[in-house]
């Protein structure tokens, strides 16, 4: 967390851009941002001694930047953000912005457990180059995270954020699904532009699309495993871990959906399901980083307590890709 003195100066610096009314941002402040497209949630590379390897981060981004992504997510779940210090998180955002073409959106994961810490991190990430803040649900006290509590939290963050805010619901990690009623209420905030929903419940995604249809609110699928279904129900894009290694294929699936080539899209989606599951639910970030090594990127180790795969797990991971024609 930033020290109080720094936080005070940050608040002072925002006085030129933030509305000081009780309602926060004036209507329409964040609504011009078009999130449509595919975003890889990039990993944070580490050295053998568990230091952040910013050089490898830049190398990966230079390679990924040649693909037709709408943008990139840094410091999301795949970025191991809970294991990084505040200064490391900010440096990752800064280095990413410098490494990426200016036409690529940079979404930065700024979520923290307290509202104040989240505001501080959001403001700081905006100052070092984030185009939007992706804010995960606070979850340590999940039993008290009612719709009212979450609405208050996100409203405060959006009121004080100098960049648009994207809600982030990832129940597999947090044990907390951002309630639909809270999403609908928050969709009315002029500086909240969308949600990344990683829960995999397509019915829920469709309901959010339906209930926010009167707002300029955008839904991003949180996985390549249900990307086709999400497009069919009204999502505008996806934040897909698999795009770190099969980026061209995930972007191809997007194109097939957008052009109505549903039979070809279905065939491709089927071939992406097992690899996607392998680098998410089954083997997680260690699995994703291992496949990055195979596909010409730098994966490397994770930070402890995440452990590398066993030989048997690595073989199972390879089979999930090879059996679908990717290796």
Curated annotation (Swiss-Prot):
One of its GO terms (biological process) is glyoxylate catabolic process. Homotetramer. Keywords: Lyase, Mitochondrion, Schiff base, Transit peptide. Belongs to the DapA family. Substrate binds at residues 77-78, 198, 222. Catalyzes the final step in the metabolic pathway of hydroxyproline. The gene is HOGA1. Residues 1-25 form a transit peptide. InterPro entries: Aldolase_TIM (IPR013785), DapA-like (IPR002220), Schiff_base-form_aldolases_AS (IPR020625). The record marks 168 as: Involved in proton transfer during cleavage. It is found in: Mitochondrion. Its EC number is 4.1.3.16. GO terms for molecular function: (4S)-4-hydroxy-2-oxoglutarate aldolase activity; (R,S)-4-hydroxy-2-oxoglutarate aldolase activity. This is 4-hydroxy-2-oxoglutarate aldolase, mitochondrial. It comes from the Eukaryota. Inhibited by divalent cations. Optimum pH is 8.8. The active site is at 196 (schiff-base intermediate with substrate). It holds the Pfam family DHDPS.
């Amino acid at each position: 967390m930033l020290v109080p003195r720094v936080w005070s100066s940050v608040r002072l610096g925002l006085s030129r851009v933030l509305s000081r009314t009780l309602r926060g941002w004036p209507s329409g402040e964040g609504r011009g941002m078009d999130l449509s497209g595919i975003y890889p949630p990039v990993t944070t590379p580490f050295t053998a001694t568990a230091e952040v390897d910013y050089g490898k981060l830049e190398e990966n981004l230079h390679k990924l930047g040649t693909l037709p992504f709408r943008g990139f997510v840094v410091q999301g779940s795949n970025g191991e953000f809970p294991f990084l210090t505040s200064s490391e998180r900010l440096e990752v955002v800064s280095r990413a912005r410098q490494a990426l073409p200016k036409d690529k959106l940079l979404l930065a994961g700024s979520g923290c457990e307290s509202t104040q810490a989240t505001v501080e991190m959001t403001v700081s990430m905006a100052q070092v180059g984030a185009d939007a803040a992706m804010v995960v649900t606070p979850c340590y006290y999940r039993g008290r995270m009612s719709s009212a509590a979450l609405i208050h939290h996100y409203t405060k963050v959006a009121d004080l954020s100098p960049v648009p805010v994207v809600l982030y619901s990832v129940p597999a990690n947090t044990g907390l699904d951002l309630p639909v009623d809270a999403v609908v209420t928050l969709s009315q905030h002029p500086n909240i532009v969308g949600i990344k929903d990683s829960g995999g419940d397509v019915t829920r995604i469709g309901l959010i699309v339906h209930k926010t249809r009167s707002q300029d609110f955008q839904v991003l699928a949180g996985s390549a495993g249900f990307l086709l279904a999400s497009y069919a129900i009204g999502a505008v894009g996806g934040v897909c871990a698999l795009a770190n290694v099969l980026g061209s294929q995930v972007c191809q699936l997007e194109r097939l959906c957008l052009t109505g080539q549903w039979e070809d899209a279905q065939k491709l989606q089927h071939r992406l399901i097992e690899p996607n599951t392998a680098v998410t639910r089954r083997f997680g970030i260690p699995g994703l980083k291992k496949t990055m090594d195979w596909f010409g990127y730098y994966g490397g180790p994770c930070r402890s307590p995440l452990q590398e795969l066993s030989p048997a797990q690595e073989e199972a991971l390879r089979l999930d890709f090879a059996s679908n024609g990717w290796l």
